[in-house]
Amino acid sequence: MLYQQIARNKRKTILVMFGFFVLLALIGAAIGYLFARTVIGGMIIAAIIAVIYMSVIIGQSTDVVMRMNNATEVRSASDAPELWHIVEDMALVARVPMPKVYIIHDPSPNAFATGNDPEHAAVAATTGLMEKMNREELEGVMAHEMTHVRNYDIRLQTIALALASAIAMLVNFAGNFWWIGGRSSSDDRDNPSSIFAILGSILLIILAPLAATIAQMALSRNREYLADAGAVELTRNPQGMISALEKLKTAVPMKHVDPSSSALYISDPEKNAKHHPFSNLFDTHPPLDKRIERLRQM
């Protein structure tokens, strides 16, 4: 089961990369058509920019994500002994290398894992998590994060985060260039086919970040159920994980969190209350009640 899930996540990584690159190509085509009337040229430029951006953020994913979330590295066990030793124990049980450990100074209990692979992983916990959770609950949370590391979820989410950010950057560039002076000529506005092409390009640029966000959120929701079950497998203590999730239900939003990193956390750090019919498409996590229910059925 474990190795099947790892293989499945690797296949998902390939599919996610392919899907995002298709989206990037379409955005490049739209930008190229709008501003230079060259679809191929726009696609090539977008691909080059995206590859450079992805190489930087993926190559430095841990440092980038930790800076975005104001996390401070724990250099030795003496700086945070309980957290350090729990992470060390859970890494040993999960049979992965000891990850780097970080602390986020925020009263809201939360945690996340990031990195490219188990050899370059890192976990972060808020001061609120360390203060509000007892040892069994903290073990459950860290086991959850170690499951993400072991199953290569961290690579999948890092790639999704990098590509979604690259898409947002390209769309932001297109919007700024449009207002500065990249609008179409009067000849284009008089040509019906050009008008439709322009409108289609604008619509694609507007909807692309939405599509990227929905894909990223779906990946995040799916991986949480598996990590909860993995935490129970590692600790042999379902009640510890259930109790931790119960406490997360009553947590307040984090004070300082980067929205693009929300999907990485064990629980939605922004605690957004959405009640419209399509809210589930944009949820970064499954409802905590459903996660608890699944654990109780194990």
Swiss-Prot record:
Signal peptide bounds: none
EC number: 3.4.24.-
GO molecular function annotation: metalloendopeptidase activity; zinc ion binding
Obligatory cofactor(s): Zn(2+)
One Pfam family recorded for the sequence: Peptidase_M48
The family this protein is said to belong to: Belongs to the peptidase M48B family.
Protein name: Protease HtpX homolog
Species this chain originates from: Limosilactobacillus reuteri (strain DSM 20016)
Gene of this entry: htpX
